Amino acid sequence: MQLEHLNLVVKDMQQSLDFYQAAFPHWNIRGEGKQTWYGVERRWLHFGDNDQYLTFNDQGYGENRPLQGNQVGMAHFAYRTVDLDGLISRMLKAGYAIHHEGAQSPYRRNVYFRDPNDYEIEFVEYSSDLPEQRNHYD
């Protein structure tokens, strides 16, 4: 079993797409359309590859939960990469700043970015294939 997709409500479809295209240049738009969701007409878009994707739904309003608080909701989601330096370079070149770096570990490096909707996304690169090292926490 694996996670197939995340469904995100966004404020601006194009700004969201721009951010994730910088992070995932090999992904593409798999499908898109319009639907009525509890009386609100909104556009949806699936962005990903053949195995996983993100769904964006526009007409989002309000603020995302503050990450410094303990409110119920998503804290962040993460993707594993084999080239963290390449990802960081693409994101910086596209105008996105690192929100913060992850904890120091001899077996992984990770950084966090905030997308245009204030979702926090972690990108992690492991330097070991051994589960006991990948799951080593100090």
Indicate where each model-derived feature is located.
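Short beta->alpha connector loops
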Residues: 35-36, 59-61, 83, 104-106
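Short hydrophobic-acidic sequence motifs that mark active-site Asp/Glu residues
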Residues: 53-55, 120
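Short, charged/polar surface micro-motifs in flexible loops or helix N-caps
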Residues: 49-53, 60-62, 84
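Residue-level recognition of conserved beta-strand positions in structured domain cores
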Residues: 56-58, 125
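Core segments of cupin and vicinal oxygen chelate
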Residues: 7-52
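Flexible, glycine-rich phosphate/dinucleotide-binding loops
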Residues: 38, 63, 129-130
